[in-house]
Swiss-Prot record:
GO biological process assignments: formation of cytoplasmic translation initiation complex; translational initiation
Domain PCI: residue ranges: 278-478
Coiled-coil boundaries: none
Protein family: Belongs to the eIF-3 subunit L family.
The entry's keywords: Cytoplasm, Initiation factor, Protein biosynthesis
Record flagged with keyword Transmembrane helix: no
Name of this chain's protein: Eukaryotic translation initiation factor 3 subunit L
Amino acid sequence: MDSDEEFIDNSLAVGDIVYDEAQIAQQQQEYAAQLKLASTAIPTVVKDFIQYFHRCLSDNSVYELHGCYENSFGKLTDKFYKNSHWPHPVAQVAPLVKNDPVFLYFYSELYYRHLYAKLTPTPLERFESYSNYCNLFNYILNSDGPVDLELPTSWAWGIVDEFIYQYNSYWMTKEAHNSDGVAPDTWGTYSVLNVLYSLSEKTKIREQLRAIKAGLDPMDVAGPYGSRPLYKMLGYFCVIGLLRVHTLLGDFTLALKTMESIELTKKALFARVAPAHFATYYYVGICYVMTRRYADAIRCFSHVLTYMARTKNVQGPRYDAKRSEQMYALLAICVVLSPARLDDSIHVALRDRYGDQMAAMQRGDLKLFEELFTFAAPKFIQPGDVHGGDPLKHHLKIFMVDVTNTLSTANLKSYLNLYATMDLGKLASFLDTDAEDLRSQLVTLKMKNRQLRWTEGELADGTYQHCSELDIALENDLIHVAEAKGGRKFADWFIRNTVKNYSVQDYIVNGDKKDKEKKN
């Protein structure tokens, strides 16, 4: 540096913290943006909605809150904020609600949820959303006793669901693996798990579910928190949230174990909220797929897909078309790896969507397995990976090992289907291999035909069962083949074709009248 040049220090020290010129400039821009937001006029109808929303939350008017959450917020979004932010919580909304901190927690939750859905959040906005969730859960968990607040069931699920979605979304970004980000501890895995475990334990939701299962009064074990509807709902949905987080982290056995005492039945609490219903079955099914329990995965996917197909027209915007397609793709994979008889309606829908792909996969097309798995799998994360590796590729690689081993026995099965007994050496000559290698293939086939299968109890429990129509036993060099085919169920076929028959007869009798009505 020349002696004539003058050094100008543009940094600023505030206590022990030193801000450089770039940081100060960034904060100036953010402050200017907030001032601009504050000066932007809020439409009268939006202002009235925010104030009405505030009154409903303060008065614990659950029915009115449900209308605000499910209907009004979405309609106003479409009219005014389809491609822009809602009014800023601090700069614009706080003065309208007398700086009510509780309302601002919940309004901010919706504000950032809308931002994630319609726009692209900046690193600062991701941090602000995380900070708001910290404040919200701190208020719920650490106030002096249970808070006097009630929410609609769908909103309680939405809070937990969005909390995990934003955590997942953060770890899919590059800045998550960069220690120089806005805040290194933003969306930490420990913090997220701590919230979910704290809510589920403080509400004693597992104890309540065990009491219900035993025919006892759950209020006897609920305690002061679990007896309140808000805490009970949040605690319950946090258990499903733990299933989801552990699945995203790749611990599939622990994910199933967190669902202790929650039964997959139509009477379960999650069945009251369609998105929760779909998510629960999807993540349980994924865990079964990744632990090679294909029969259980088929049972899960078949059940929820049947429900989704039957209620599609009444669900409206809550119908998750992408989730449905993902589960059909996973079901196709499972049926190829572990053939099973499906409900007739599901079989037809699956054949229409993936009939050609399934035929190709049965012939050993590994690329199709990879494509369907990549499309259908959740967005796995690996928070501790500073190198930013792709966890999806890691899980795909593990999954494809089992696929390759399973498909390696396909040619062997085609020969065994033709015989009741067969000499080991003769079959080895057919397959152009040696006897020892064939023994290894037979053991692989025997093991692949056995799966851990749920019958009763917890979701992670099960007994090893034979899950194939073909079974083998080896006596010295003689292979014994047993084939068990279950009886076909014709009820669905007769019902469906009877309905078609009636419709054809009706058209034959009244066809002219119906044609005239169409013309008119």
